[in-house]
Amino acid sequence: GTRYHTAVQLDVGLLLSMHLTSQGDITATGLQPAVYEEQVRQRRRGVRLDEDVRLHNGQRVARPAGVQDAASQFVELSHRLATGQLSTEPGTAIPLWLARPGGVDEWTYDVVGEDTLHLPRLGAVRALHFRPRPLAKPRGPIHAEIWFAPSLQYLPVRIRITQGPDTFMDLLADTIEQQ
């Protein structure tokens, strides 16, 4: 099988430093994460995904089919969109299991619709807006809305990370590099 490695890095000066990494296998059904690590500020936490999921505290929980992690979800959703596995109709609900250091939860993203984003270097870009539903048992106030650009192989061009009613980061793609 073929392996993958993906990383998401955010550095907002002294306010926040966040680094997410995911490694695993590329299979016929999509990405299959094996190791996920996140470092927020100086705190490093991780998850191991084998037959089951080993959380940061050592607890083992069942591994749902197709489970992703906080970094691999962006690549997996882009792939599913680009290959026509997901509907882009507004109102479509897209379920996705996510493994994070504190637990495994089923997230549901709603396709909100299509927006035209004005990106600093890329100009006007049409993008599909995905919004997560609140979790039944939230592990914290953080959630991420994602905009995927059909003209850029459905890569995410905007991610809005919200932590509570008044705190958010709005991340816009500056350049798109593919390897």
Feature map (PLM): residue ranges:
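Hydrophobic, well-structured mid-protein blocks that either form specific transmembrane helices
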Residues: 45-87
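Acidic, serine/threonine-rich low-complexity disordered tracts
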Residues: 1-51, 90-179
